[in-house]
């Protein structure tokens, strides 16, 4: 997921994407613990996507606070 795509999302879309990514991260963590994980790079991709979404949410919240 590219930062441009994340910034284009609405707040609801960000929340939905964040929830889906966290669920996938949870599943991958179990696969890794049981030794069934096939694509180890996917875990890092998910972690970075979660960070991107949280960064955009924080930026928007700080902009709202400054605007108030």
UniProtKB/Swiss-Prot annotation:
Keywords (A to Z) from UniProt: Ribonucleoprotein, Ribosomal protein
UniProt GO MF annotations: structural constituent of ribosome
CDD domains: Ribosomal_L29_HIP
Top-level lineage group: Bacteria
A single cellular component GO annotation: cytosolic large ribosomal subunit
One GO-annotated biological process of the protein: translation
Pfam family for this entry, one: Ribosomal_L29
PANTHER family the record matches: 60S RIBOSOMAL PROTEIN L35/50S RIBOSOMAL PROTEIN L29 (PTHR10916), LARGE RIBOSOMAL SUBUNIT PROTEIN UL29C (PTHR10916:SF0)
Similarity remark: Belongs to the universal ribosomal protein uL29 family.
NCBIfam families: L29
UniProt name for this protein: Large ribosomal subunit protein uL29
Organism of provenance: Maricaulis maris (strain MCS10)
Gene that encodes it: rpmC
